[in-house]
Design a protein with these regions (language model features):
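Short boundary segments that mark the start of a structured unit
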Residues: 1-346
C-alpha cells in the first residue's frame, strides 16, 4: 500500500559555519629574473622550491625583469598562477647607495600593475652624466582577483633592489654602436658629449678673430655643464707665420672656460704692418678637456656624422694681407687689410 500523505522536509542551514581547516596558505613573492622569456621552471630548484632572487642590475639604458609568483607553505610554485598585484617604485633604505630618480633614470609609468606568474620589465634610461651606480626598489602590494582561498603577499619577499650601472668618467673613451655602460672603457653615443671649436677661417691683417668652444651631444645640442669646465686650446703658427703676426706665440696653450652659459670664447688679434707678406695661416686646436667627473665621456678626437655642420676640434685661419702697390690712398682712420690701406701698411 502506498502512503499518499504529504511529507514536509526542512533543510537546516548553519548560520555560523565552522571555519574550514587544513587550508594551506598561499604567499605571493617577487623575484628578479634575467630576461623576458624566463619561466617559473627556470627559477625552480631541484627540490621544487622557488629560487628567490631579490637583487638585479643592468647597464644604463638596459632593462630589468621581475615576476610575482604564488607559492605554497613549502615555498613551491603553484601549478596555477593568477591574480593581480600593484607595482610600487621606491628608494633604497640605506644611505650607502645612491638612489635613482623615477622618471629620470628609469621608467616608472609603463608597468604599474602585473599578473601573478607573468614577467614584467622596467626600462632604464641612458644619458651622458657620470652619476655612478644608482639603486631603486620594486615592491608588490594590493593583491586582487586571486583564485586562492587564503592568499597574501609575503612581506619578507615582496621587494627587489635594482641597480643601474654607470660608466666611470673619462676623456676620449671609445664610442661603439650600441655601447652599454660597463666597467670597461667602451661607451655608447648616448654616453658621450663632444668638445667642438668654431671661428672665422679668414681675417684681414689687423683684425681680431673670436673663437667659441662648447660641448654638444650626439645630435649637436648644446650641453651646459654644472661645473666650470676648462678646455685647453693650442695655438700653432703655420708656414712663415711668426709671433710678429698675432698676439699669440707658437704652441701657446690657451685655457678656455665653459661656464653656465654653455660656451667659452677667446680671441686672436692679428698685427698689421707694412710688409706685403702674402696670406699667412695659423691653427687653434682643442688638445685637452678637463675631466670634472660630470660626464661619462668627453670626446674631442672624433665626431659622429649625426652632429650637423661638420664639427671639428680645430680651426685654421688665414690672415689676408694687402697686395703690394704704389701710391695707394691711405685711410687715416686705420684701414684693415683687404682693399683699404692703413698707416701701418704704408
Amino acid at each position: 500500500v502506498t502512503n499518499t500523505d504529504p511529507v514536509t522536509t526542512t533543510i537546516k542551514d548553519n548560520t555560523t559555519p565552522n571555519t574550514e581547516t587544513n587550508v594551506e596558505d598561499v604567499k605571493i613573492v617577487l623575484v628578479a629574473v634575467s630576461s623576458a622569456t624566463t619561466t617559473i621552471a627556470d627559477i625552480t630548484n631541484s627540490d621544487g622550491t622557488l629560487k628567490v632572487t631579490n637583487t638585479n642590475e643592468t647597464p644604463e639604458g638596459g632593462k630589468l625583469y621581475y615576476i610575482a609568483v604564488a607559492v605554497d607553505k613549502d615555498g613551491k610554485p603553484l601549478a596555477t598562477q593568477d591574480g593581480d598585484v600593484t607595482i610600487n617604485y621606491g628608494t633604497t633604505p640605506t644611505a650607502s647607495g645612491k638612489d635613482a630618480t623615477a622618471g629620470v633614470d628609469y621608467d616608472n609609468t609603463t608597468t604599474i600593475t602585473t599578473k601573478v606568474g607573468v614577467v614584467f620589465e622596467v626600462e632604464t634610461k641612458d644619458d651622458y652624466y657620470a652619476e655612478g651606480d644608482e639603486n631603486f626598489t620594486v615592491k608588490i602590494t594590493d593583491l586582487k582577483n586571486s583564485p586562492y582561498e587564503t592568499p597574501s603577499i609575503d612581506t619578507t619577499k615582496d621587494t627587489v633592489t635594482s641597480t643601474i650601472k654607470d660608466n666611470a668618467p673619462t676623456i676620449n673613451g671609445t664610442v661603439v654602436s650600441g655601447g652599454e655602460d660597463t666597467n670597461s672603457n667602451t661607451y655608447g653615443s648616448e654616453d658621450t658629449v663632444y668638445a667642438i671649436i668654431t671661428g672665422e677661417t679668414t681675417v684681414n691683417e689687423g683684425g681680431v678673430v673670436t673663437y667659441t668652444v662648447k660641448l654638444v651631444d650626439k645630435d649637436g645640442n648644446t650641453v651646459i655643464p654644472t661645473k666650470e669646465t676648462t678646455v685647453t686650446v693650442t695655438y700653432t703658427n703655420i708656414g712663415t707665420t711668426s709671433t710678429d703676426d698675432t698676439n699669440k706665440t707658437n704652441n701657446q696653450e690657451i685655457a678656455v672656460k665653459i661656464d653656465a652659459s654653455g660656451k667659452g670664447t677667446f680671441t686672436v688679434e692679428t698685427k698689421d704692418d707694412y710688409y706685403a707678406e702674402a696670406d699667412e695661416n695659423y691653427n687653434v686646436k682643442i688638445t685637452n678637456v678637463q675631466n670634472t667627473g660630470e660626464f661619462e665621456n668627453v670626446k674631442f678626437d672624433s665626431y659622429p656624422n649625426t652632429i650637423p655642420n661638420s664639427p671639428s676640434n680645430n680651426v685654421t685661419t688665414t690672415i689676408v694681407d694687402n697686395v703690394a702697390t704704389n701710391n695707394h690712398e691711405v685711410d687715416s682712420d686705420g684701414g684693415v687689410d683687404g682693399t683699404v690701406y692703413g698707416k701701418e701698411d704704408t
